[in-house]
Structure formats: C-alpha cells, structure tokens
C-alpha cells in the first residue's frame, strides 16, 4: 500500500501526510491504510479549492491555471495540511477579519464567498452514516459539511453542494480512479474495511465491574446512571441559555447572565488616603554604592573585609545628625546605632587581624531597634482555658493609602540600563544536556539585553542580602551580627567591582517555623534628600552622615550623603524566596520565548535572530494614560524582567489577591475584544473582590492604575 500511495499521489501531498502522521505519533509503515486515507483527503481538499476564484464584483468564477487572470483572489483558504499551530493561527485570523464564529475543531477549508468554514469528508462507507457522524462530532451550524464517497455519492449540509457540477465531477472521478487502482492491486478490500467512524475514545471504552459501580456512585444529584449523565452532557449546548443551564445544575444557583459590552466595565476604584510608602526590604533607585574596582586586598571575598575596604574609599564622613525623624520611633536610638557601627568598625581596623564576622555589642539602642524583650510572653493555651475574658489582641484595620508617583518612578528606573554588567552568561544555568542550538541562542540574546539592567542589579542584591541574612540567622542565633550589604559586578571594560550599599544588624533568630520572624535594622547609603518626598520614607529615620564630591562634565560638586535607617523583619520562607530571585530571569525569558514562538509559527520558521536583531521594529510594552507604550525588543525584555522582580520585591497577600481577581476581569475584556460576546453574572462581586485587595501596597496600587489605563484603551 505504501508503494501505491507514493506512486499514485503528488509528492507534496505524500510529504504533508507523513508530517501529519508523525505529529500524531503514528507509523505510516504500519498504518498504511490510514496513510492512503490522509493522502486521499488532502487531495480532495486541494481539488475542491483548485481553479476557484472571486472576481472584483465578488462573484465566484472558475479559472484554469494558464489563464492570465489567475491573480484573482482565491475563493477558498486551505486549512487542512498545515501543522496545528499554523492552522489555528489561520483560523483565528479568519475569525478576526470576517467575524466568523471560531470552530471547536479544525475545519478543512474556509469559503470567502459564502463566509463559512467547510469540513470535507471522504468515506468508504455509506455517505449518510458518515455525514451524521461528522455532524454529531462538530455540533455546529456554522461549519458546512460536504461528504464524498468512492462510489460517486455525495452529501452536504442542507443539500448545498457549494461547487458547480463539473468541479464535483472531477473529484468523484479521481476518487473512482483511486478505487479502481487499489482494486487492481488487491488493496481495496483491506482499505474499505479499515475505515473507522468518527467515534471518540469514550464511546469505544467500556467501563465495567468496580469502575462502573464507582462511576454510578460518583454522579451529580438527579442522575440515576452513567448513561443518563452522558446523554445530558452530550446534549449540553455551550452557547445555549446559560441561566437555564445553571438552574439545571443546582437548585441553589440563581444567576442572571448580563451581556458584557464596551460600556459595561467601570474603572477600578483606587483608595483615597495619605500617599503610600516604600516597603521594600532594601533601597532601590535611591541606593548609593561605595565601590572598589579590581579588588585584590587581603581577605578579598570575605564580606567584612570587602566592606571595610569600600568604607575606606570615602573621605567625607562627618558628625551624623537626624534630618527626617521616624514619627513613631525613638530616633536618637537610630542615630546611636549608626555611631556604634562606625565605632565598632574602627575597633576592628585597630586589631591585628580582622575577624571574618562581627557581632555587635548588645547596647540599649540596638536592643530597642531589634525589639529585644518586646515580644509578649507565650503561654500554653491549655493553661488559659479558665480565664473568662480571654480574647485575641484587637488589631486595627490597615489604613488605606493612595497611589503615589514614586512607585512608577521606581519601576521606570528598574527598566533602565546601568553602566555595569550584573550577570555573567552562566547565571541562568549551564547547559546540562546537549540543548538545541536555538535555545542557547535565545538565552544569549536575552542575557545581552538584560545583563546591564537595573532590575538585574536588584536581583543580585536581593540574592546576596537574603543569603547572608539566612546564613547568619542559622549560624549566630543569639548574636546581633553585622552583615554588610554587598553586590559584585563588572564594568563595561570587564573589570571586577565590589559594591557596599550599607549594613544590616540582625536580631535574635531562633527560627523554628518557616514564618517565624527575625528582626533586623538596615542602614543604607543614599544621595536622595528624604525631605523631597517625606511620605515615601514614613518608615525610615534618615541621617545626614557626610558630603560626597561628585564629578561631572561641568566640574565637581558636593552633595550631602544620607543614611536611611529602619527596623524591619523577615522570615525563613521570605529569605528562601529572596535567595531564588534569579528565577525572575527565567520567568521573563519564558515570556519573551512565547512571543518568539508566536511569531515563528506565523512565519513558519524560527524568528529568534530577526526578533532580536531587527532594531527598527517596536513591540507593545504596556498601557499608560497616553495609550499603548511601545519600545525595542530590549526594552520589552527589561520591562518584563522588572515586573517579575517587583513581584518578588513587593510580594504580598494584596498582590496575590489582586492578580487572581483582576485576571478574571482581564479575560472577559479580552473575550470582548475578540468579539466572543462574553456574558457575566455578579460583576459587582468581582469588582468588590478586586478592590478589597487595594489597601496600601504601592506595587498593587500601581498595577491597578495600569489596569485602568488598559480598560480605557481596550474598550475604545
């Protein structure tokens, strides 16, 4: 049979059939009859389409190939024979441009004259039996069915045969010829008997015995046996009256489906109140680094040694004083804590040998800042059962905060390029197995786009701080250990660089459970004057600690250097995720990869190189009040990375809730944009669920603001 197929059919058809069988994991050496059936079906689809065009008046005409007018528009779009991804891309494109309803199964053709999809069937059995099987499977009035048999019979939806008699006769003649050729070689009987109907796996799969009894017991209420339930499900029209279907499902459900129109959605209400404040565990755009290039000092790589070396590069220290107090804290204690750090670092330098770690003296200011002896005594619940007025602490509702412009500025800054390289190529992971060439190429292109990005600096900074803090929490549980906040990078010229952002002092850390909290005081250098945006620094006490000489094109200038001090806390589980912030690189790489895949499936070739090297093309980055923002592919990479990094830095229950609930509204809006006529019930409840997550988190408030911009432009 295989030899016959290769002789009888056009090589292009044979190649397409081979691809189709390979895609479904079938062996054409074994399933030879199926191979012949696929080739026959492909040929009929192509013959159905051949010579049929639409002229300028919109009339269907038949034109032979050597006719000079063959540049007219083809009447039929051929979907059969394409790989699945490409076929669905074509179907979606047709639906978007013509407004046709999207079919559930891939059809074979689209008729531009009649504006309908066509399912072609070629059967070795009775045409009416095969027609019913097809109709039962498709269950759609919008797909036209046309069945041909090898005996010259045909059947079509509503007896509408689409083509002229001569074109159909050509198909029937070809099928009859194939049958005769097969019969001459003794292949016809086997081929005729091998045809299976359009049954599904469930219809062939008989459930018996224990599994059958379990199936009968597991049915929803009001169904006596599996057959009844199957019949109900088979007859369940997805596009029917949803209210009726819901009431059929349960007596308790009483939902009224409202059509979702362009005028239906309203903007998400953002809370009023004082502006939101910075709540990340370390400074982002406002951080200042004291750096050493090409470090080669004794003990290089030991954090404390590196920190002291970095501190020595700055000569503008002065007597510190408070410029922005913390409203609720004992501010002199923060000032004394910094003075203590300076004094104890000086003590270390006076020693003969610098120690690897430094435990701070447990002074009153550090005990206060780290909450030592502040936790209420824990009492076993069983010992309290008899206390009549036993109750939980009264906890205040969190104060609502409004969106502030600083968080958008932080995000914009995270997307920018720095003049340093923050990840080496192997940060994403060496190839363990012989990975395909394309994957490595994509990774290298992506790394080149993000290695200088400020968001990548935040990743490396977060990984270092969380790793150091978790190590110290386990190794020195009772000590107030001094932990330098360090990062490492390379200059554009490739020189190594060690950076010091400030210090952390860790409190007592007997962390038994994942959520047990370790307190710490962070002290971070900055050139940002806190008086410019005092609301951003609500949780901080800010000191002025020195003057820094900055060199620029216009000469030297002196700027005050500040120290941002605050009490903070974290847990084992938060530190564990902080240590894994490199995952953000992987997540954003996968998002870029899905964009490349979509482009490649349309062009039917790998588009990685073009995607990254075509600098003139712009891509959508996000929504703003001005509309859809666009940028280069590098900007897209950095924006996606920054979003992933901020999701990690500002992780919170508010973000989890907002992401989950707003996604539902997003899907409905996208369905409306795709002309799918969505319906909703209890839309007010969905808005309530979204808005109860908008409390005081700056990143969530910014995302809600972006969502409102998206709604405005999506529904124009």
From Swiss-Prot:
Top-level taxonomy: Viruses, Riboviria, Orthornavirae, Negarnaviricota, Polyploviricotina
Cofactor(s) listed in the protein's UniProt record: Mn(2+)
MF annotations from Gene Ontology: endonuclease activity; metal ion binding; RNA binding
Cofactor binding, per record: Binds 2 manganese ions per subunit.
Coiled-coil annotated residue ranges, if any: none
Positions bound to Mn(2+) 1: 41, 108, 119-120
Protein name from the UniProt record: Polymerase acidic protein
UniProt KW keywords: Cap snatching, Endonuclease, Eukaryotic host gene expression shutoff by virus, Eukaryotic host transcription shutoff by virus, Host cytoplasm, Host gene expression shutoff by virus, Host nucleus, Host-virus interaction, Hydrolase, Inhibition of host RNA polymerase II by virus, Manganese, Metal-binding, Nuclease, Phosphoprotein
HAMAP family with a match to the protein in the record: INFV_PA (MF_04063)
Subunit: Influenza RNA polymerase is composed of three subunits: PB1, PB2 and PA. Interacts (via C-terminus) with PB1 (via N-terminus).
GO CC terms, sorted: host cell cytoplasm; host cell nucleus
